Amino acid sequence: FGGEFPDGKVRKGYSKDYIHSFSAVLQQSFRFAVFPKQLISFNPMQYIKLKKQAEEVDLFSDDEVEDGTQPISHEDYERLIKYLEKKNPPAILPIQIAYYAGLRIGETCGLTWQDINLEDQCLTIKRSIRYDGAKHKNVIGTTKRKKVRIVDFGDTLTEILKAARREQLKSRMQYGELYHRNYYKEVHVKNRVYYEYYHLDGTQEVPADYKEISFVCLRPDGSLELPSTLGIACRSVSKKLEGFEDFHFHQLRHTYTSNLLSNGAAPKDVQELLGHSDVSTTMNI
């Protein structure tokens, strides 16, 4: 998504993911301004449709398609966390979960505290959060393969999750009635059912058809850390943190996979942990 100025200069384009994430942030901002804030009467973004740009393909190239994603060393991971502690603390917990459990970005954001068993050190992955451009909503749906899976984790992530829970309880006390709670709404369209995500603070009336859900990855005010804002955080890292020029959230999943395989885990076991449809996908990471 780039272009050429009238004077002939070519502007560097933005990636598709960047455009969609930026659009999602605008959608949410304007929607919030309409309701509950009532600052404007309508959402101007509801009339915006993003253009699709066809990817150019060299039909006669002999080159094989390569992902090119490299695993992150533990030293670089620790450097990333230190950077985020200063620049973007809400992004830390989802990145830690993905690094130690190999979840996709939507699965990470979709985790609830009910999905986590700290005593047995395992988590259940059964939902994912994504932005639906057609509906202009964040929706809660199934995982990519539409299957429930269980992932074990160790002492490090256990302590991280316990600390996060304590911090969230502390934030709830500090924010008081301004602390946000998260909800989903069941929507029926023709023969389909989907679930929209919403968040409201304690001063706002909760509609009767909203059901509360206790997500794990929260912002300080209690609202959900969404995949779109996580994507923006990762792009910021790739631009500003030395050595992370090609960083993206999915790289954490690659790292988790690489660590398991290099430590002798059976490919079939890793496949099940990751929720891949076949073992060849796992081995190509």
Which residue ranges define each predicted feature?
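Short, basic (Lys/Arg/His-rich) helix/loop patches that form interaction surfaces
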Residues: G8, K12, K82-A91, A101, ...
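Generic recognition of well-ordered alpha-helical segments
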Residues: A24, Q28, D155, E159, ...
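A short, basic/aromatic helix-end/turn motif that makes direct DNA contacts
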Residues: G110-I116, Q271-S277, I285
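Catalytic-site neighborhood detector that most strongly recognizes the C-terminal catalytic loop/helix
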Residues: I129-Y131, T255, L274-I285
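N-terminal core-binding DNA-recognition domain of tyrosine site-specific recombinases/integrases
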Residues: F1-F32, Q38, S223-T229, D246-Q251
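Short, conserved phosphate-binding/catalytic loop or strand-edge motifs used
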Residues: F1-P6, L50-Q53, T257
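Conserved tyrosine-mediated DNA breakage-rejoining catalytic core shared by Y-recombinases
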Residues: L50-Q53, L111-A208
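Basic, Lys/Arg- and aromatic-enriched nucleic-acid-binding interface segment
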Residues: V10-K16, H20-A24, L39-I40, Q46-I105, ...
